[in-house]
Amino acid sequence: MSHNVITRFAPSPTGHLHLGGARTALFNWLYAKHNNGKFLLRIEDTDKKRSSKELIDSIINAMSWLKIPYDGEIVLQSKNISRHIEIANQLILNNKAYYCYCSEEEINKEKEEFSKKGLYYKHNCIWKNKNFTIDNLTRVIRLRSPTEGVTSFDDKVYGNITVSNTQLDDMVLLRSDNTPTYLLSVVVDDHDMNITHIIRGTDHLTNTARQLLIYNALEWNPPKFAHIPLIHDEDGNKLSKRHQAIGIHEYKNLGILPEAISNYLLRMGWSHEDDEIISMDQAIKWFSIKNIGQSPARLDNKKLEFLNNHYISLTEDEVILNMIIPIIEKKIGYMLNEVKKGYLLKGLYELKKRTKNLVNLANESLFYVEDVPISIDQEASAIIKDYKHVFSILYNNLSRISEKEWNNSILTSTIKNISQNLDIKISNIYHCLRASIVGRMNAPSIIEIMINLQQEECLKRIKYAQNIE
């Protein structure tokens, strides 16, 4: 294993961290950890109009929630602008770049002419070969790109990538307002941070070819690149703006566990044999770029629900309880007392097995914490109405059981006797208990629920059902 691998994640704080960015961060982190290397975080905050402190915090918090820790201090790209400008001027001195005095109007007119002819536009600057400067005239610094040959690199996912230099223009390095462009800033920062490997989406392939021209001009060794296929929707189409707008913080608010998201993202484009459920410790041990596929990954909400259910089931009941209490309290509008929390804790083991997410679990658990009258759905209301005469008998028989005898065996035999005495199917008696105690038919074992809620609370609910007109 290499001990000098350094990867990075370099988000722009113009939006929240989304699935694609989170996967990029995860893959870079895993590759670094697999190789006993370092994973660095750089915030590319040079777009001051769209960047904000709130979005920077949102990205950092999302990474922390996903348990993707970075090494060292966060690098803010905006702090390095003077260094970027210095490099642009160095390229001028070395005749690897030149001043371009063409106006925006001239360039736009040129673009229109190329567009009308259906030709690929590449700015052919008249200033490229002039060796003098003009003071007090608006100018930019452009890279002196080669006009012949090819730019190629060995992509660790796709193999050899070759781009004709005729397709690569003399890119702007420094704007007329003396601000560096993205392409220059990224190259300088990656070099200064000693980045050895960059894993990013295939939408950066053209950027990589252009950045390699800058590396060549500076005579710097470029990092190794691995471009990962983009994420598509369930139908195999490019993600719509609606899908792209779903941030990691929103998945958190929906009640998805970070372990589930990480496992889900890991399997989006990367595989290890036929394993679906993979812990992060296993992922660090197994991660290899050669196991990243070339086909776009697809969103699969069913798989995410499956993984989330798995990790919720593995998590200790007390931990899950503390996660869902705020959701429940927000819904009901008051704080739960210790008795209600006790009911919840007892019932969580069974409820966890059935849930998709924490919000769903909180909603499914509400019957444990509701006061009489509890919420009763339409199906349960119909059963209460149809079996009105049963509830007084249920109440009388169940109230005769002592508190110490309120257990599975006694409750089961009592319900069986009621069924036989009334000549009603035992399943219908259980329906009556579900309707009155839970308020719905879809719930775990009613006997277990009755034991968890205890006798007094169950009798209150049965009594209420008995008196419903």
From Swiss-Prot:
Its main location: cytoplasm. Its EC number is 6.1.1.17. It is an enzyme of class 6 (ligase). A motif ('HIGH' region) lies at residues 11-21. It catalyses: tRNA(Glu) + L-glutamate + ATP = L-glutamyl-tRNA(Glu) + AMP + diphosphate. Keywords: Aminoacyl-tRNA synthetase, ATP-binding, Cytoplasm, Ligase, Nucleotide-binding, Protein biosynthesis. The keyword Aminoacyl-tRNA synthetase applies. GO terms for molecular function: ATP binding; glutamate-tRNA ligase activity; tRNA binding; zinc ion binding. ATP binds at K241. GO terms for biological process: glutamyl-tRNA aminoacylation. It is found in: Cytoplasm. GO terms for cellular component: cytosol. A motif ('KMSKS' region) lies at residues 238-242. Catalyzes the attachment of glutamate to tRNA(Glu) in a two-step reaction: glutamate is first activated by ATP to form Glu-AMP and then transferred to the acceptor end of tRNA(Glu). Belongs to the class-I aminoacyl-tRNA synthetase family. Glutamate--tRNA ligase type 1 subfamily. Monomer. This is Glutamate--tRNA ligase 2. The gene is gltX2.
